[in-house]
Amino acid sequence: MVTFPSALRAISRVRAPRTAPLSMNMTRAMPIRRTLATSKDPLFLETPNASDDVFQPLDTFLRRHIGPRPHEINHILKTLGYSSIDEFVDQTVPEEVRLPKNAVSDDAIVALSESELASRGGEIANKNKSLRSFIGMGYNNTTVPPVVMRNVLENPGWYTSYTPYQAEISQGRLESLLNYQTMVKSLTGLDIANASLLDEGTAAAEAMILAHGSTNGKKHTFVVDENVLPQTISVLRGRAKGFGINVVVRPLVRDGNAQLPADVSAEDISGVLVQYPDVNGSLVDWEPLVKEVKGLGGTVVAATDLLALTMIRSPGEWGADIAVGNSGRFGVPPGFGGPQAAFFAVSDSLKRRIPGRLIGVSRDANGRPAYRLALQTREQHIRREKATSNICTAQALLANMSAMYAVYHGPVGLRRIAARVHALTRIVHAEIEALGYHVSNKNFFDTLTIAANAEKVHAAAVSAGINLRHVSPEHVGLSLDETVTLKDVHALVGAFAQAAGKTGTTSEQIVARSRELGLDASSVDTLEIGGFNRTSKYLEQPVFNKYHSETDLLRYIHSLQAKDLSLTTAMIPLGSCTMKLNSTSSMQLLSKPEYHAVHPFAPLDQVEGYMELISELERDLATITGLAAVSLQPNSGAQGEFAGLSVIRAYLDAKGETQRNVCLIPSSAHGTNPASAVMAGMKVVPVKTLPDGQICLDDLRAKATKHKNELAATMITEPATVGVYFNKSKEAFNIVHENGGQVYLDGANLQAQVALTNPAIMGADVTHLNLHKTFSIPHGGGGPGVGPIGVAAHLKPYLPGHPIHATGGEHAIEPITAAPWGSASILTIAWAYIRMLGWHGLRTSTQVALLNANYVADRIKDLYKVKYVGKHGNVAHELLVDVAEFSQYGVTVMDIAKRLIDYGFHPPTCSWPISTGLLIEITESEPFSEIERLVEAFRLIAEEIQEIKDGKLPKDNNMIKNAPHTIESLTGEWDRPYSRERAVYPVPALRANKFWPPVSRIDDVFGDRNLVCECGSVEEYA
């Protein structure tokens, strides 16, 4: 009898958290070791029972995380012809890169139970000091409506779904993202907005690249006002290098007028970036500058604030071409840097160059309106090195939160929130000036810059529990938000009074001051900001004006959720996407205010908890990759690629090898690889892939030798994107090293490496990891993501830095993202996942993921062509099925994908990495019953194809060609050559539990030809 993998028979140590009861802490003197080798262990049973050691916790995570039960794993092994999991792994993972059994200590990462993890997470959270942060700088506190917090952020129906490439089963979140686009378009006054970007800094960088591209790359100067957010300026400088753009930072307001600097060649200006309101809080009339820039053929970019835009003129009204910013203050807390959804809106002339994902309206096969991703041919997975951006992951979940915030409050509610914030800022302005201080900015919305002895003011503020912005020794800044109360205003004014050596104002006096200023409740709604007052209407669409009670919004949220297939519904077998369990225990820390309410620029002595968690996660990831150091800053896999290549670029430049700019990339690589290489200023040279999916070493050697003096790097994904390990990865990496290049190992498929092999043993210099794949951060319907990089020791000095908090090495490159540690709040999820599994749990997860994929490959190999297998006939963690042979019967990849929806599944990855392929990945979390259900679906679809082949069904009118089938299609006239029952209940079990797609197959061509990217009434689309 084969038992659960040896990884489950490891010995782990119980570590009592500091906050545990005394009785638990007593175990420190006599450590308890968990012995998991006996048949009585709960991991080996369907139901937990007493183990040999009564002190062992029963809420261990591994047995909940792994889908197949031990007897089912034995069945899978027997089916595949193996007597043990170790024998299977030895035949799957190439020996030359396989980690020796004892290469990593059992105690390198000690597993905690779910309750121990919760206790440890709370202990760390309590080390973060809960001061009120009025720092601003693009990050503000917000009141998250509980109905949105509970039913979107904390709802697996929203956070476990994938990017909506399969539009028929994504109508709910597509509608919500369309609401987001409409919200941004309306408030910015521009013509079209995308469905979110990663953060404000990277959005501004995308705008800079768009402006550069609009001149066909002929103009190389991008002018930035000195009062743009400092982190944005740093991100721009880092991004500009690869494109040869010169970022010029200058004061663009002189003598009270906005104008271009005299010392910059006007003929070379591609665009200008201004902040509105600026970092100091000032509102500037940018219209004269806009006219000047446009007269030169340049592009004007405005970084702006959505809440302020409910009161001040929109960028579109004063002539901006692009508006970017952060929508976090619409119901998404700062999270020590994120995640929050950045927005990006453009004028009509730029709509086909807009980066990121774009939601549009099309129609389905029945002529009904339906939502879809529009203009997908712009995206990097299609255009590769010709793409204008490498953006892949965005911030869909957070964009949906912000959209729901706007839906809940509506235009009137948003205006009221903004007016209250502005009124409180006026009151603070008056009180501070009454104390003898001078406020530097005359026109403002929510931010003030005050001339003062900064050291004294900051000391007084911190003692009052308040953080202010560090501007200079002679100035401090403050920024108010919707969470501010009378108590906060009293404490804030009191701190300035204390610093001035004066008596503080009482709360009653502050209330009296508000009345003197005419700022009572009845007048706030009619407040205006002189000279900048917005008169145009916004958010007039029905969706923003009808769901203002909690019951209404709750039902609206759930009506959208019901239209989408998520992991709460079924398996999502997307190859190269790793849709594994996002456990409740991993997600719980995210909801704690000690994590999500922290400002990213809070003093480091106030965030000791975050620093401890970040340090532990960096250490764990270094252990897993075998590399020397890790940066958690990149907030997507694509950003990780750019970061890793930029680190390589900096290292080579420091060696004086600036001529090295060639990047060798296999033709089978994901499209982000060539797009990222181009962004990093490299020239892409493709390397051939052999018919068996392996890299052609002869071609690699020839091209590495040919470009020996110019070779900078190679980018290789291991296992390959075709679903197999490379047999000679060490040899391939040595070829590159021998010719002076660095090896970038794309971590997209790290799922098949963890604790079995690693980038270091293969010889990689740098890798990125997708925490939203391998380490269980949810995909969120298209983001958030985290893409940290690990580097070898020689690259450590070049890890990304930051202008506010020092990160990275002594020769740090410019920041990749706006926040020092990226989307820090969701690092808690990956940290929890790793800590609950421990080293051996991680190993077991990888083993079972490999096993599940090979089981599916074995079960369907006689019905479909499994395109690639490894040396011993196995695949890695995913399998590529080639359905080209069915085209002669009129059946395409997309036909099979849509038919799988009728069986209750999300389709696999379609038409990639080959156009006729289905890339299937089965994670370790999927129950054996669900795996069997998928196998049965493929078997029955093969039978349906056989009926077409035999002439029993016409090629153009069958259950595959007409899939997916909706309830509406059943209730109408039925003239199809197959029964309704076969259409929607191809297996009996679907009668008891069926996911019904809300629309039939969508017409993509019609949607792109008739581009509509904002919401309205259904009648408008008909």
Where are these regions (language model features)?
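Conserved PLP-enzyme active-site core in the AAT-like
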Residues: 172, 202-370, 432, 436, ...
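A structural preference for short, hydrophobic beta-strand core positions in alpha/beta folds
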Residues: 194, 249, 302, 441-442, ...
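A conserved hydrophobic secondary-structure block that centers on an alpha-helix together
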Residues: 183-204, 218, 222
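Non-catalytic terminal extensions of PLP-dependent enzymes
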Residues: 2-75, 91-131, 143-159, 165-171, ...
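Proline/glycine-anchored alpha-helix kink/cap motifs
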Residues: 208-216, 238, 395-407, 826, ...
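TRNA-binding/sensing appendages of the translation machinery
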Residues: 80-97, 320-325, 764
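Conserved phosphate/anionic-ligand binding catalytic regions in large, soluble enzymes, centered on
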Residues: 332-345, 349-350, 394-398, 479, ...
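Short, surface-exposed loop/turn segments at secondary-structure boundaries that line and modulate
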Residues: 95-107, 200-213
